[in-house]
């Protein structure tokens, strides 16, 4: 006869009943404390089963000769220049600082050296060869495929470093190029401003030459210094002022130099009669040249033809 499956509520009630029973048993044994609803497990006790350990050791222990085992237990070799017998060490005090990498590696090296010095004579007595034959092929610990991968990885890393270095150099060159370009543009602007100032000075008569047209290749600072020095040394009116004085006179009061005096009134040496009566102003022309007849004459001539 098949029993119907239990519902979720019935299964939860059975689990709760089992849990309650366990809690009651634990409480009766004194494993529960006030405020706890979980059984606390006590700390595990360490068992030192000496007989069991010896039995396990006897199962895999083999009495082999030393040449098959090649085990030695030695201390480090004495340091160079020190006493041959190793100095007694205190067990409580460590001879080598484990945090010092150099001392730790040197202790490994000295201990291996002591083992080699102690084992080689025994191997020679047992006639065990300690040197490899000339045709011995020693296979590497790592395969060629793995070494090839390591080589490719190193090459990739080196190529990445070279690309990074080239990128740094290109950035530095671009930065330097921008700096040089900016300096060139500033120099051109300064030269242009100097040229415009020279043109303005030439137009106003402050200068009688244009340096940039004469191919003056001196630096701008020297030209400015020379121009300022020339202006300080130059005395007298400018070229523009001299031209205007020549054309229009000096202007202002002439101190009576052009007033009529007795001497100037009596001086008739420069008098010309033809010029005074207007005869000298006429231009000589061809005598008997044909002139256009007047309006009435032209009308009479026209009526005659009709």
Swiss-Prot record:
Its localization reads: Nucleus, Nucleolus
* Keyword Phosphoprotein set for record: yes
| Known tissue expression | Ubiquitous.
Task: Give coiled-coil spans as residue ranges.
Answer: 138-169
Classification from the root reads: Eukaryota, Metazoa, Chordata, Craniata, Vertebrata
Q: Which residues are recorded as modified (Phosphoserine)?
A: 7, 9, 11, 13, 16, 264, 270
Instruction: State the PANTHER family in the record.
Output: RRNA PROCESSING PROTEIN EBNA1-BINDING PROTEIN-RELATED, RRNA-PROCESSING PROTEIN EBP2-RELATED
Q: Does the keyword Acetylation apply?
A: yes
| Residues recorded as bearing N-acetylmethionine in the entry | 1
Q: Which domain of life is it from?
A: Eukaryota
Subunit annotation: Specifically interacts with EBV EBNA1. The EBNA1-EBP2 interaction is important for the stable segregation of EBV episomes during cell division. Interacts with WDR46.
Please give the name of this protein: Probable rRNA-processing protein EBP2
Q: Origin organism of this chain?
A: Homo sapiens (Human)
């Amino acid at each position: 006869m098949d029993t119907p499956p239990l519902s979720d509520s019935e299964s939860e009630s059975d689990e709760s009943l089992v849990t309650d029973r366990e809690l009651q048993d634990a409480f009766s044994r004194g494993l529960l404390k006030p405020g706890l609803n979980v059984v606390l497990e006590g700390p595990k006790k360490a068992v030192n089963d000496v007989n069991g350990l010896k039995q396990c050791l006897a199962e895999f222990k083999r009495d082999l000769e030393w040449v098959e085992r090649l085990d030695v237990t030695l201390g480090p070799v004495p340091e160079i220049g020190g006493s041959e017998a190793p100095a007694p060490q205190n067990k409580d005090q460590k001879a080598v600082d484990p945090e010092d990498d150099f001392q730790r590696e040197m202790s490994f090296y000295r201990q291996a050296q002591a083992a080699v010095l102690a084992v080689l004579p025994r191997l020679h007595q047992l006639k065990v060869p300690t040197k490899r034959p000339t045709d011995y092929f020693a296979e590497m610990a790592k395969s060629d495929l793995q070494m090839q991968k390591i080589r490719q990885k190193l090459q990739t890393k080196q190529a990445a470093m070279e690309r990074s270095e080239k990128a740094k150099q290109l950035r530095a060159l671009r930065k330097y190029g921008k700096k040089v370009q900016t300096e060139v543009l500033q120099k051109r602007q300064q030269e242009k401003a100097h040229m415009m100032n020279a043109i303005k000075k030439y137009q106003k008569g402050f200068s009688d030459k244009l340096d940039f047209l004469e191919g003056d290749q001196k630096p701008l600072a020297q030209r400015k210094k020379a121009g300022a020095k020339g202006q300080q040394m130059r005395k007298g009116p400018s070229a523009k002022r001299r031209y205007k004085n020549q054309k229009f006179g000096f202007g202002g009061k002439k101190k009576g130099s052009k007033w009529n005096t007795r001497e100037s009134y009596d001086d008739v040496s420069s008098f010309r009669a033809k010029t005074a009566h207007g005869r000298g102003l006429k231009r000589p022309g061809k005598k008997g040249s044909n002139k256009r007849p007047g309006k009435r004459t032209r009308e009479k001539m026209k009526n005659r033809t009709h």
